[in-house]
C-alpha cells in the first residue's frame, strides 16, 4: 500500500492498495487537507480554527504565506522561498524546517494508522529536491529516537515521479478505471 501526498494549494492524497485507489465509505479516503494537527486550535473561532488543519501547515500556499509574513512582504511564491533558502536566508530556512516538521508529524500520524511502506510527495513544490529531503530529515528526527517502541515500520519518503501533474494523472486514471 502506498500513500501519495500532493502539496499545493491544499494537501491532496490518495491511498493505493493492491493497485487500486482505496475509496472506502464516501470516496474521500486520503483527502488529507482536513487532517487535524492542532487540537487546541479547534476551540478558536473561525477563521483561526482553520490553523488546526494540516493543509494550513504544509501546503505550498501556507508556507509561502509564512515566509512573506516573516519578511514583511505582501506575498511570496515558492521560487522566491527556495531561492532564499539556497542563498542561506535564515527566515526561509526556519519556514522550511517548520514545514518539514509539520509534514513529518502528519506522516507519522498516518503511519500509526496505515503502516505504509512508502509516502510519495507530489505537487509543484516537489519539483525542488529539497522538499523531500527536508521532510525525510524531519521524519527521521521524529521517528528514529522512538523506533524501538513503534509497532509500525519506518516508511520510505520519496518524490513522486509525476511531480506537479500527480493529482491530474491520478484523477484521469481514476476516471478511466471507473468508466
What residue ranges belong to the model's regions?
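Glycine-rich phosphate-binding loop of actin/hexokinase-like ATP-binding domains
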Residues: 1-55
Amino acid at each position: 500500500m502506498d500513500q501519495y501526498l500532493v502539496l499545493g494549494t491544499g494537501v491532496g492524497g490518495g491511498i493505493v492498495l493492491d493497485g487500486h485507489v482505496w475509496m472506502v465509505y464516501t470516496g474521500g479516503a486520503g483527502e488529507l487537507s482536513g487532517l487535524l494537527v492542532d487540537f487546541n486550535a479547534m476551540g478558536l473561532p473561525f477563521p483561526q480554527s482553520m490553523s488546526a488543519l494540516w493543509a494550513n501547515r504544509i501546503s505550498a500556499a501556507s508556507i509561502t504565506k509564512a515566509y512573506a509574513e516573516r519578511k514583511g512582504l505582501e506575498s511570496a511564491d515558492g521560487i522566491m522561498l527556495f531561492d532564499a533558502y539556497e542563498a542561506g536566508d535564515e527566515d526561509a530556512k526556519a519556514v522550511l524546517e517548520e514545514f518539514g516538521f509539520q509534514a513529518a508529524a502528519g506522516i507519522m500520524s498516518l503511519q500509526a494508522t496505515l503502516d505504509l511502506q512508502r509516502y510519495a510527495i507530489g505537487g509543484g513544490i516537489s519539483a525542488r529536491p529539497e522538499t523531500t529531503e527536508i521532510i525525510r530529515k524531519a521524519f527521521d528526527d521524529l521517528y528514529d529516537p522512538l523506533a524501538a517502541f513503534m509497532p509500525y515500520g519506518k516508511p520510505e519518503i520519496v518524490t513522486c515521479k509525476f511531480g506537479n501533474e500527480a493529482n491530474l494523472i491520478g484523477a484521469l486514471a481514476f476516471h478511466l478505471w471507473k468508466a
